[in-house]
Amino acid sequence: MRSMPVVLWAVLGLLGGCARPGPSPAASGPANAGLPPWPDRPRASAGEAFTRAWSDGRAELSGYRARVNRYGEMREGELVLIYVTEPMDRRTWVKDDAVAAPHRVGVLKLNASLRFQTGVYPYSVLTSVFAPVDRYRDEAFAPVKITLSVQEWCGHVFHGVWPGDGRAAEQVMSYFAEEGERRRDVATPGGTLYEDALLIQLRELDGPFAGGGDWRGSLVPSLWSIRRAHRPTAAVEATITRSRAQRDGAEVHRFVLRYGGYTRTLDVEPGGARRILGWQASDGEDVHLVRTARLPYWQLNHNGDEGQRALFGLGDGGEAPDGAPRTPP
């Protein structure tokens, strides 16, 4: 079994702007208590094309205009999808620039940052997906951890899921009395997918999704949808069909996700960076790409760096700049 290419290991070690310096943490305590086991070895290493594209020491940031449904009304908001590679310690599934083999696992991290207003108060939603770049499961980029944090004026909520074989570990910390703080296991049949990870997997960055065909099986809905519905986390039967379609005069790969009475249609670039161009959902959600940039964003935290936001479609105040193309060349 080939190990991850050396160049990607080197770059993962450099992406430390969001890390705290210091020694590696011990593999004990709440961070790894009860985590499901993960395969010792990958089935295949990350491909050379993926490694070349994601070894430039930068993150990919895409800004979107979003309409989301909350409290029965549509809200205008902004969404940023941030993709970056980084190393994790497989004993705890936390980022660690200093961890060495055999505990070091390179992942592609997606941070999905959603902001919108509900009347007098704002909502801030951050979903993080951590997916190894080497293939450990049937489907590439199977996640090892998914977390959601929601902040609004009533309070804040954390929801984490750690997928494994036959089960996923779940932790919820909520200001709601009926939810409180709890840990439990969620049954997940073999081959279960996670809706939050589809924003990585459907990009087909290292080979076709579902072998290039349609998919049917078990899926855990997005943590944000679970949060809004105040329902327990559970795997549901779902389908994903694919086709070629037209969007703004250009050909796209179109994926349609269906489960229960819910439908979500996602359009993806068929080549190049394979960006998520947008999606529409049966609950009225409507998301459109504005602009994409590759930046070492962790270095752009000084006064005056606010102007860099326009490079990925957001103005200084969080709005898309006038005339910004929705799907840039």
Predicted regions and their residues:
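Bacterial N-terminal signal peptides that target proteins for export
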Residues: M1-L8
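C-terminal motif of bacterial Sec signal peptides marking the signal peptidase cleavage site
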Residues: L15-G17
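Bacterial signal peptide processing site
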Residues: A19-P21
